[in-house]
Amino acid sequence: MSSNSFLTPRIIEVHNLSPLRAKVVMEPFERGFGYTLGNALRRVLLSSIPGCAPTKISISGVVHEYSTIDGLQEDIVDLILNLKGVVLKLHSKNSTVLSLKKDTEGIVTAGDIESSHDVEIVNPEHVIAHITSGGRIEAQITVEKGRGYLPSVNRSREDKSLSSIGDILLDASFSPVRRVSYTIENARVEQRTDLDKLIIDIETNGSVDPEEAIRYAARVLVEQFSFFADLESTLLPTEQPRAPAIDPILLRPVDDLELTVRSANCLKVENIFYIGDLIQRTEAELLRTPNLGRKSLNEIKEVLASRDLSLGMKLENWPPANLENYVKEPGHASS
C-alpha cells in the first residue's frame, strides 16, 4: 500500500437496537478522520434530514391558541403540544390538509386523524387529547415537508396570507432525527494501531430508518464537497480605479472668470491657470503676489462668490493626474 494513500473503511456494521435506534460502526480511518467525519455527519443528521410536521391548525369554535373547548380536558396550548408529537410521512406531496373529527367520549389519538393514501401516520397510538361527556373536536391540520426548525413567527412575517382568523400557525420541527452521538475508538490494521473506529449512535422518530438517515447525510456531504474537488480559480473582473468626480467649473481656466487684465496677469505669474488652482490659495498668499493689491483681491473674491466658491478651499487629489484629458473632454473649455 502506498504511504500517500488514505485508508477507507473496510468494515461497516449496523446494529439495530430498536426500530428507532441504531449503532453504525465504521473502521478503519486514518488518525483524526474519525472525529472529522463523525462531527460533520452529526451536524448534517441533526439539521438537514427532511421530514414532515404539522404547521397550521384550525379548530372549530377556536379563535386563538389561548382558548378552551367545552368538553375537552386539555386547553388549546396543551393540544398543540400533543399534536407536535404526531409523526407523519408524506409519500409524494409536499403539503396536505388532514381532518380530525371526534364527538365520542374518550381518548383522541393520532389514529383518529383522517388520512389519505399519500399520508402515513407512524405513531397512531399517540395521544392528542381527551374528550369528556358531551364534548367534541373538529379541526383541519396542515402538514408540510421541510428541514430543520421553522418558528411560526418567521412564516407569519414572510407571508401574511398564510393565516386568517381562527388559523393557528405552529412552530414546526421537521427533523426526524431525535438524537445523534458519536464516539471514537482505536482500530488496528495489520501492524498499525494508530487508526480510528467511528461509532455513530442515532435515534429517529420512526419516519426514517436510522441507516437511511446516515446514507442521506453522507450524500449531502459528498455533494457539498464535490464542489471543492473541481475547484478552479476564476478571475473576477476588476474595475479600474476611477478618478473622483470633479466639479467641471474647477477645470475651467481663470480667464473664464473675466477678471481685469491686471488681476489675470498676476495670477498667471503665480502659475494659477485653473479655477481649481485659484480657490486653494488663501488671501494672504494672493496678497504676496507682485502687483496684486487689495482691490484685485476683492474683485477675485466677488467673482468667486458669484459662483458659490471662495478662497482657501481644500481639494483632494488636485491637480488630477489626467488634467489635460479632463480639459479636452466635450463640455470643458480649454485654456
Swiss-Prot record:
Domain note: The N-terminal domain is essential for RNAP assembly and basal transcription, whereas the C-terminal domain is involved in interaction with transcriptional regulators and with upstream promoter elements.
Functional description taken from the UniProt entry: DNA-dependent RNA polymerase catalyzes the transcription of DNA into RNA using the four ribonucleoside triphosphates as substrates.
Taxonomic lineage: Bacteria, Pseudomonadati, Pseudomonadota, Betaproteobacteria, Nitrosomonadales
Quaternary structure and interacting proteins, as annotated: Homodimer. The RNAP catalytic core consists of 2 alpha, 1 beta, 1 beta' and 1 omega subunit. When a sigma factor is associated with the core the holoenzyme is formed, which can initiate transcription.
Family that this chain belongs to: Belongs to the RNA polymerase alpha chain family.
Bilayer-crossing regions: none
Name of the protein in its database record: DNA-directed RNA polymerase subunit alpha
Keyword RNA-binding listed: no
Stretches the record annotates as Alpha N-terminal domain (alpha-NTD): 1-232
EC number(s) recorded for this UniProt protein: 2.7.7.6
Top-rank EC class of the record's enzyme: transferase
InterPro entries membership: DNA-dir_RNA_pol_insert, DNA-dir_RNA_pol_RpoA/D/Rpb3, DNA-dir_RpoA, RBP11-like, RNAP_asu_C, RNApol_insert_sf
GO cellular component: cytoplasm; DNA-directed RNA polymerase complex
UniProt region (Alpha C-terminal domain (alpha-CTD)), positions on chain: 246-335
Gene name as annotated: rpoA
CDD domains: RNAP_alpha_NTD
Keywords: DNA-directed RNA polymerase, Nucleotidyltransferase, Transcription, Transferase
Reaction catalyzed: RNA(n) + a ribonucleoside 5'-triphosphate = RNA(n+1) + diphosphate
Source organism per UniProt: Nitrosomonas eutropha (strain DSM 101675 / C91 / Nm57)
GO biological process per UniProt: DNA-templated transcription
Gene Ontology terms for molecular function: DNA binding; DNA-directed RNA polymerase activity; protein dimerization activity
Tree of life domain: Bacteria
Coiled coil spans: none
